[in-house]
A protein has these predicted regions:
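Hydrophobic hinge/microswitch elements
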Residues: 1, 8, 61-120
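Short beta-strand-centered segments that line the small-molecule binding cleft or hinge
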Residues: 1-27, 31, 39-40, 68-69, ...
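Short, well-ordered beta-strand segments
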Residues: 5, 30, 55, 101, ...
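Short secondary-structure boundary segments
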Residues: 9-10, 33, 105-107, 133
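Small-molecule pocket liners
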Residues: 17-19, 24-29, 33-35, 46, ...
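Alpha-helical segments flanking ligand/cofactor-binding loops in enzyme cores
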Residues: 20, 45-47, 91-92, 148
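A late-sequence structural motif
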Residues: 36-37, 98, 120-156
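Secondary-structure junction motif
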Residues: 37-40, 45, 52-73, 143-145, ...
Length: 156
């Protein structure tokens, strides 16, 4: 059991969880930068997104973002290459040419340079609702001295 967690804020925050926002994060759609079939698919003027393979998060706010992206682009049956548990794995799979992925830009910025140099950003989020990164704690534990002291120094 963790005392605190740093996480993306879900659409619906459980009532027992306190959330203090740290930062709004940009979300980026990335593709392989090296020559490969996926790069060829996305390099045309109007890509047929329904045929492009996607690497997706298995759950969480990023998963919901890509589902919204699919709806906005009227893609009812996306080509899912893989569903993974970590954003870092998504960057590596894109760098290998497996597909494209939507993820927080900070993940890409903190990826190892050899991996980061093998991907390109296709688009940045222009959404009205930002991806909020923050600190979470159980409300019932906010009175504990260590958690209370930490919570008081947070920006919100």
């Amino acid at each position: 059991e963790a005392d605190l967690a740093i996480a993306g804020k879900p659409e619906t925050l459980p009532g027992a969880v306190a959330f203090s926002m740290l930062e709004n994060l940009a979300v980026v759609l990335i593709a392989p930068a090296l020559p490969c079939p996926v790069r060829n698919q996305v390099s045309v003027d109007k890509p047929d997104w329904s045929t492009v393979p996607f690497i997706m998060a298995d759950q969480g706010p990023v998963r919901r973002r890509i589902e919204l992206w699919f709806r906005r682009h009227k893609i009812s049956n996306p080509q899912i290459y893989a569903t993974v548990g970590g954003h870092e794995a998504m960057v590596s799979m894109v760098a290998l040419g497996c597909g494209v992925a939507l993820l927080p830009e900070v993940v890409l910025e903190n990826s190892p340079e050899p991996v980061r140099n093998r991907v390109m950003i296709l688009e940045r989020s222009d959404e009205k609702t930002p991806f909020e990164l923050g600190v979470c704690a159980q409300k019932k534990r906010l009175h504990e001295p260590l958690i209370d002291a930490f919570w008081k120094i947070l920006p919100n």
